[in-house]
Curated annotation (Swiss-Prot):
It comes from the Eukaryota. GO terms for cellular component: nucleus. It comes from Homo sapiens (Human). GO terms for biological process: regulation of transcription by RNA polymerase II. GO terms for molecular function: DNA-binding transcription factor activity, RNA polymerase II-specific; RNA polymerase II cis-regulatory region sequence-specific DNA binding; sequence-specific double-stranded DNA binding; zinc ion binding. Gene3D superfamilies: Classic Zinc Finger, DNA breaking-rejoining enzymes. This is Zinc finger and SCAN domain-containing protein 23. InterPro entries: SCAN_dom, SCAN_sf, Znf_C2H2_sf, Znf_C2H2_type.
Length: 389
């Protein structure tokens, strides 16, 4: 399942982060006032690791060791910038992450939460996806898409958030879909499907990296040797086991079941329309806290997810996931009328209007209809603008 792959992806990225931390420490080891930007979650994680991993043997004596620890703690907690409450929040957050199971800790750290509340929301989202993959994510996607449409200027890039799958390709520098493609189910990423893989040799480096992902619970299919075939029965059995989690909380409206009552309560808001989480900046409301957190990045401009190929950054990992298809050339969405393929499902839906004749965009001045919104914008220029009196 997609969420299983993402959990194990988090562990892999945690290991990659450790390597990156070491590289950046070596690069900026000239002193405490390094070239690192100290105002982002990734840098705070680097300083935290420096503080926690400092060894007594690295200093010539006890006084120097204590002084170095004080410097490292200062770099991490930044008392000249943070209030006592903020410092306490960082310490509680660190301890909260420490007590989590290893695989969950890696998953949460991947999202770089800045508070305990945000870390809890990440975990609740994970539980929700295990309960009902896709539904809540698509709900967030719809809310974000509507907001972006309202606020975006003409020509602004749109970030799709209809998928929570984070690819490893930008970390490994390797087209994993060519080695072991992802099975798409109803337009959503599913499990690695080795049966779709070409019969060619896979490098030992890539093979070992992918196999690391499967060591937690084995839900990722074993990477085959050259010419091997997938054990279909074994894969189906693993899928049956993963779907056998008890879900005692049942929605009286639609019959869907959930593992926790809190997730059922949030689900019921899709029926009632309740949106208790409101943005302080623009007043927009959301049914879930995670939707509000994602939305707030539009105001702050925070973009945590960066493409290692071209450097472009995104506020959500789904935006990076779709962007990577530009580099890989992947076009998984195919028109059943003309067989033309597209990298995004939304583009396929717009393309299909050519075949169906649907023209949803109407000019209020003359009543002419258009397939694409951009065509309507262009058409409006033919109408004279009424001068204000």
């Amino acid at each position: 399942m997609a969420i299983t792959l993402t959990l194990q992806t988090a562990e892999m990225q945690e290991g990659l982060l450790a390597v990156k931390v070491k590289e950046e420490e070596e690069e900026h080891s000239c002193g405490p006032e390094s070239g690192l930007s100290r105002n982002n979650p990734h840098t705070r994680e680097i300083f935290r690791r420096r503080f926690r991993q400092f060894c007594y043997q690295e200093s010539p004596g006890p006084r120097e060791a204590l002084q170095r620890l004080q410097e490292l703690c200062h770099q991490w907690l930044r008392p000249e910038m943070h209030t006592k409450e903020q410092i306490l929040e960082l310490l509680v957050l660190e301890q909260f992450l420490t007590i989590l199971p290893e695989e969950l800790q890696a998953w949460v750290r991947q999202h770089r939460p800045v508070s305990g509340e945000e870390a809890v929301t990440v975990l609740e989202d994970l539980e929700r996806e295990l309960d009902d993959p896709g539904e809540q994510v698509l709900s967030h996607a719809h809310e974000q898409e509507e907001f972006v449409k309202e606020k975006a200027t003409p020509g602004a890039a749109q970030e799709s958030s209809n998928d929570q799958f984070q690819t490893l390709e930008e970390q490994l520098g390797y087209n994993l879909r060519e080695v072991c493609p992802v099975q798409e189910i109803d337009g959503k990423a599913g499990t690695w499907n080795v049966e779709l893989a070409p019969k060619r040799e896979i490098s030992q480096e890539v093979k070992s990296l992918i196999q690391v992902l499967g060591k937690q619970n084995g839900n990722i299919t074993q990477i085959p040797e050259y010419g091997d075939t997938c054990d279909r029965e074994g894969r189906l059995e693993k899928q049956r086991v993963s779907s056998s989690v008890e879900r005692p909380y049942i929605c009286s409206e639609c019959g869907k079941s959930f593992t926790q009552n809190s997730i059922l309560i949030e689900h019921q808001r899709t029926h009632t329309g309740e949106k208790p989480y409101e943005c302080d900046e623009c007043g927009r409301a959301f049914s879930q806290r995670s939707g509000l957190f994602q939305h707030q990045r539009l105001h702050t401009g925070e973009k945590r997810y960066q493409c290692s190929v071209c450097g472009k950054a995104f506020s959500q990992n789904a935006g990076l996931f779709h962007h990577l298809r530009i580099h890989t050339g992947e076009k998984p969405y195919q028109c059943n009328q003309c067989n033309k393929s597209f990298s995004r499902r939304s583009v396929l839906i717009k393309h299909q209007r050519i075949h169906t004749g649907e023209r949803p965009y109407e000019c209020e001045e003359c009543g002419k209809n258009f397939i694409y919104h951009c065509n309507l914008i262009q058409h409006r220029k033919v109408h004279p603008v009424a001068e204000s009196s």
